[in-house]
Amino acid sequence: MSDVLPARFLTPVDLAELLGVPVETVYQWRRKRTGPRGFRVGRHLRYDPQDVRAWIEQQMTVGIA
């Protein structure tokens, strides 16, 4: 997983490309508070790769249970 995620903060477009989902899905997750935790830098939405990794691992655990 660490090989795939960059060492910089991700944009919604980066996250969508990484997960193979439309960008609108990333924004819907944000509105519904179901996706990875994001934060704002001024007007720009960013995602910490560590938070994305934790969210993916959580989704994998939920899918197994």
Q: Could you tell me what each predicted segment is?
A:
Residues 50-65:
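A short, Lys/Arg-enriched interface patch at domain edges and termini
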Residues 11-12, 21, 41, 45, ...:
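Hydrophobic aliphatic residue packing
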Residues 18-46:
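Major-groove DNA-recognition helix of helix-turn-helix-type DNA-binding domains
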Residues 1-28, 58:
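Polyanion-binding surface elements
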Residues 13, 36, 63-64:
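Serine/threonine-rich, low-complexity intrinsically disordered segments
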